[in-house]
Amino acid sequence: MKLRYLFILLIILAVTSVFIGVEDLSPLDLFDLSKQEASTLFASRLPRLISIVIAGLSMSICGLIMQQISRNKFVSPTTAGTMDWARLGILISLLLFTSASPLIKMLVAFVFALAGNFLFMKILERIKFNDTIFIPLVGLMLGNIVSSIATFIAYKYDLIQNVSSWLQGDFSLVVKGRYELLYLSIPLVIIAYVYADKFTLAGMGESFSVNLGLKYKRVVNIGLIIVSLITSLVILTVGMLPFLGLIIPNIVSIYRGDNLKSSLPHTVLLGAVFVLFCDILGRIIIFPYEISIGLMVGIIGSGIFLFMLLRRKAYA
């Protein structure tokens, strides 16, 4: 699919998203907004749209980076346990700093997510798997262990409601003043694009990339830092978006190949389009109620993930 088609589709979905909701708002109202309509548009609908686009494109890039540096098409922040580590970090920040600002929570979540990513990569270095499918299974098992620890702590200290809010991604609570931290993902996306060629070289293996003059460890560490920061920002702001970083890069690689700089713009747009589509679908299925974006992405994403597992020889 060409970039211009993805961009046009994104614009169509974005405009549609602005006018879907319990509060009536039509395109004609834009020419003469009442105080209530202006509040709905600028305090709720536009912040929600912006957060959807940023979360979708940034989490898709996270998956693309992780698949490159791990050299496995089934690795993503979901299957590597990164999201579970970030959630545990947020929970720990609530215990240690009861009145912590969102920035402090994000930093603690980042430290935990980064530690989890390093642990996952160390496991991959120490254990060589003949079948590529075992690598994400290790990440999923590790993530389940971390998730169980987080749930235990949450029950022990009566924080289970907080954990549940991050377990299912939800854009319904995104309003002006509660999503701006996501803007920090934008410079990280730019850095990812600058390092795109280096990530592509790193995906060829340590010995090969070092022979080409690449500082392999440094590039891998930068990639893990970008992934950990973005994951922490997204989970803290909107919650978990499972399988997003897994399916979007794989879909793009089918028709764009594995060159990261070439596939990154398509990954960005397709990620935003996919999340926006899932959000709109979740808002209209049981209107005026809505299904959380985490559930919609999880259902559709897990279906695509299962399909890729069945076709793993084609994607490995």
Swiss-Prot record:
GO terms for molecular function: transmembrane transporter activity. Its main location: membrane. Disruption phenotype: Disruption mutants are unable to use petrobactin for iron delivery and growth. InterPro entries: ABC_BtuC-like, ABC_transptr_permease_BtuC. The chain crosses the membrane at residues 5-25, 49-69, 94-114, 133-153, 181-201, 224-244, 268-288, 290-310. Keywords: Cell membrane, Ion transport, Iron, Iron transport, Membrane, Transmembrane, Transmembrane helix, Transport. GO terms for biological process: siderophore-dependent iron import into cell. SUPFAM superfamilies: ABC transporter involved in vitamin B12 uptake, BtuC. It holds the Pfam family FecCD. It is found in: Cell membrane. It is a multi-pass membrane protein. It comes from the Bacteria. GO terms for cellular component: plasma membrane. The complex is composed of two ATP-binding proteins (YclP), two transmembrane proteins (YclN and YclO) and a solute-binding protein (YclQ). Part of the ABC transporter complex YclNOPQ involved in uptake of ferric-petrobactin. Petrobactin is a photoreactive 3,4-catecholate siderophore produced by many members of the B.cereus group, including B.anthracis. Probably responsible for the translocation of the substrate across the membrane. Belongs to the binding-protein-dependent transport system permease family. FecCD subfamily. This is Petrobactin import system permease protein YclN. It comes from Bacillus subtilis (strain 168). The gene is yclN.
